[in-house]
């Protein structure tokens, strides 16, 4: 792959594909974490007198947080200390005229890329490069800088479509993500522990199967809905309330697959031994072997219990490499943040090289000011895809672009 230092950006138009997709409450963006993650790259380009055109998506059609990128431009302006112009267009005449009008060290924010139908579909690179988006903008662009690691598992026009048309370069964030994840995956340091929580159960099953089969993990600790599915696969009854919830989410069908994985790797997958529910207005912890399991019929599980936290924390202390994705429970409710916070604190306090990823995981880390984690990944789905051993279209596109343009005359000039 290229590096940012390979090119001269003076007076060049750079399309910077970022992933600034952020949590929203009451119509307002409530986290600037992903904005801060790309500041280094933007500042580098501005210092080298580039004309920077930023493209990002925000949510997807019909969702409440499917907003314009006007707020994104305002937040970025505030963080950069530089005016970021916003244009409510993507590749139409208004957008193209705004790009043509840019001067060196100026920044333009395009409209939410998913307002264009082409950006809501996934297609091979060959199709993406023939879209209106790529055909209209490529004549105006000199280089593409890709910082959208969080979307690296998607194959959409803005993410891969320019790869064979213009040199596509990983930004500092993309480079950092690839380096950290590769180290964790390939490292021979032991023990290597994976912590899989949250709601992306199928993706987590893919990770568990891949890292255990290829001896990339010594132990997997589970929580969140991932833990629920593995607990059911072990034959425990989690009650009507929880089984109904998993069924509504389409996750019950994954119990059989979890059971197959357990049959092959049983000693290496740990599940919670107790859970926490809300009962009569309080946090109540129920041991799986106790006579109080009837509460699971009435109350949904909201967190792992104290015994599980203690067991997981002891295991994490001895780790050399830790990869964690997803919370242990419903951390948004303070009484049920305990599992997530304590497990992530244990990760931070360990001597291990540690990676934590996933939108909810990142939110909990910042909310509870957890320190000591080696690398906080901006990617959730992309990170899981990587550790599942599957190809990431954006990384493939970066390699394709390098092969196409590595002998280009402008290189290093």
Curated annotation (Swiss-Prot):
Enzyme Commission identifier(s): 2.7.2.3
Protein's pathway: Carbohydrate degradation; glycolysis; pyruvate from D-glyceraldehyde 3-phosphate: step 2/5
Catalytic activity annotation: (2R)-3-phosphoglycerate + ATP = (2R)-3-phospho-glyceroyl phosphate + ADP
Primary subcellular site in the record, as a coarse category: cytoplasm
Main enzyme class: transferase
UniProt cross-references to SUPFAM superfamilies, sorted A to Z: Phosphoglycerate kinase (SSF53748)
Residues the entry annotates as binding ATP: 332, 358-361
Gene Ontology MF terms: ADP binding; ATP binding; phosphoglycerate kinase activity
Keywords: ATP-binding, Cytoplasm, Glycolysis, Kinase, Nucleotide-binding, Transferase
Residue positions binding substrate: 19-21, 34, 57-60, 114, 154
Record's keyword annotation contains Membrane: no
Domain of life the protein comes from: Archaea
The UniProt record lists the keyword Cytoplasm: yes
Record GO biological process: gluconeogenesis; glycolytic process
Localization per Swiss-Prot or TrEMBL: Cytoplasm
InterPro entries xref list: Phosphoglycerate_kinase, Phosphoglycerate_kinase_N, Phosphoglycerate_kinase_sf
UniProt GO cellular component terms: cytosol
Family per record: Belongs to the phosphoglycerate kinase family.
Subunit-level organization: Monomer.
Entry protein name: Phosphoglycerate kinase
Source organism of this protein record: Thermococcus sibiricus (strain DSM 12597 / MM 739)
């Amino acid at each position: 792959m290229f590096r940012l230092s390979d090119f001269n950006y003076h007076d060049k138009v750079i399309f910077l594909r970022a992933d600034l997709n952020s949590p929203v409450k009451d119509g307002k963006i409530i986290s600037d974490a992903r904005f801060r993650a790309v500041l280094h790259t933007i500042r580098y380009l501005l210092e080298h007198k580039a004309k920077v055109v930023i493209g990002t998506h925000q949510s997807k059609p019909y969702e409440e947080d499917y907003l314009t990128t006007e707020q994104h431009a305002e937040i970025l302006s505030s963080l950069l200390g530089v005016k970021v112009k916003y244009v409510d267009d993507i590749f139409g005449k208004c957008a193209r005229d705004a790009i043509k009008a840019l001067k060196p060290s100026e920044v333009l924010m395009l409209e939410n890329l998913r307002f264009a139908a082409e950006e809501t579909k996934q297609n091979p690179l060959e199709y993406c490069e023939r879209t209106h988006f790529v055909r209209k903008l490529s004549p105006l662009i000199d280089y593409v800088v890709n910082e959208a690691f969080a979307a690296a598992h998607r194959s959409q026009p803005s993410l891969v479509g320019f790869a064979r048309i213009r040199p596509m370069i990983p930004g500092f964030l993309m480079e950092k993500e690839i380096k950290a994840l590769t180290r964790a995956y390939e490292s021979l340091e032991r023990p290597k522990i994976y912590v899989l929580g949250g709601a992306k159960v199928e993706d987590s099953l893919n990770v568990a199967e891949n890292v255990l089969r290829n001896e990339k993990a010594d132990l997997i600790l589970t929580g969140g809905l991932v833990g629920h599915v593995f607990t059911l696969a072990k034959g425990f009854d989690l009650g009507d309330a929880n089984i109904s919830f998993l069924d509504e989410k389409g996750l019950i069908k994954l119990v059989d697959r979890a059971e197959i994985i357990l049959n092959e790797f049983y000693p290496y997958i740990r599940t919670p031994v107790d859970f926490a529910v809300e009962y009569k207005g309080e946090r109540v912890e129920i041991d799986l072997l106790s006579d109080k399991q009837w509460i699971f019929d009435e109350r949904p599980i909201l967190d792992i219990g104290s015994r599980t936290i203690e067991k997981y924390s002891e295991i994490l202390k001895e780790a050399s490499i830790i990869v964690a994705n997803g919370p242990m429970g419903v951390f948004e409710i303070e009484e049920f943040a305990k599992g997530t916070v304590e497990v992530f604190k244990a990760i931070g306090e360990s001597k291990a090289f540690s990676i934590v990823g996933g939108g909810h995981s990142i939110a909990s880390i910042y909310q509870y000011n957890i320190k000591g984690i080696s690398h906080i990944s901006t990617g959730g789905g992309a990170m899981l895809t990587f550790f599942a051993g599957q190809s990431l279209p954006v990384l493939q596109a970066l390699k394709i672009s390098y092969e196409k343009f590595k002998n280009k005359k402008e290189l290093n000039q």
